[in-house]
Swiss-Prot record:
Cross-referenced PANTHER family: RIBONUCLEASE (PTHR11437), RIBONUCLEASE 8 (PTHR11437:SF25)
EC category: hydrolase
Organism field: Chlorocebus aethiops (Green monkey)
SMART domains found in the cross-reference section: RNAse_Pc
Biological process, per Gene Ontology: defense response to fungus; defense response to Gram-negative bacterium; defense response to Gram-positive bacterium; innate immune response
GTP-binding found in the keyword field: no
Name recorded for this polypeptide: Ribonuclease 8
Function: Has a low ribonuclease activity.
GO cellular component: extracellular space
Swiss-Prot/TrEMBL keywords: Disulfide bond, Endonuclease, Hydrolase, Nuclease, Secreted, Signal
Record-stated family: Belongs to the pancreatic ribonuclease family.
Record InterPro entries: RNaseA, RNaseA-like_dom_sf, RNaseA_AS, RNaseA_domain
Its EC number(s): 3.1.27.-
Gene: RNASE8
Active site: H42, H149
């Protein structure tokens, strides 16, 4: 009797689950390595206004990203962070590293709009950050380890 009471709901839930699974968790462009995409999304040595900086990201993913943080230092400095002692990431993996001190950052938070007209408020701060790292892939700079994910602003 239980299956009869369930009706179409299990099928609907299955179809909904399959549809949601098609949405990419990481909208990394196919022609970029994880490190190159990290650099595009998060490394900005010279601060830019959020609306301008985020439009560069939106053109790849074709939607308005809810929140993004830019690190105002060269990629080489962020890559050096990958040489600090390992710490646990938010997901429990042990491939994260914290910056040696506070760094200049800009956080861009979506306030309204639909792609391509995304509107953001920006918050400037100095804070340490935590990045996840991996070995470089073909096409990445020649560092022993490269940042691939901004895990947290501390």
């Amino acid at each position: 009797m239980a299956p009869a009471r369930a009706g179409c709901c299990p099928l609907l839930l299955l179809l909904l689950g399959l549809w949601v699974a098609q949405i990419p968790v990481s909208a990394k462009p196919k022609d970029m390595t994880s490190s190159q995409w990290f650099k595009t999304q998060h490394v900005q040595p010279s601060p830019e206004a959020c609306y301008l900086a985020m439009s560069n990201i939106s053109k790849y993913i074709e939607w308005c990203k809810d929140l993004n943080t830019f690190l105002h230092e060269p990629f080489s400095s962020v890559a050096t962070t990958c040489q600090t002692p390992n710490i646990a990431c938010k997901n429990g993996h042990k491939n994260c590293h914290q910056s040696s001190g506070p760094m200049s950052l800009t956080m861009c938070e979506l306030t309204s709009g639909k792609y391509p007209n995304c509107r953001y408020k920006e918050k400037h701060l100095n804070a340490p950050y935590i990045v996840a790292r991996d070995p470089p892939q073909q096409g990445d700079p020649g560092y022993p380890l490269v940042p691939v994910h901004l895990d947290k602003v501390v």
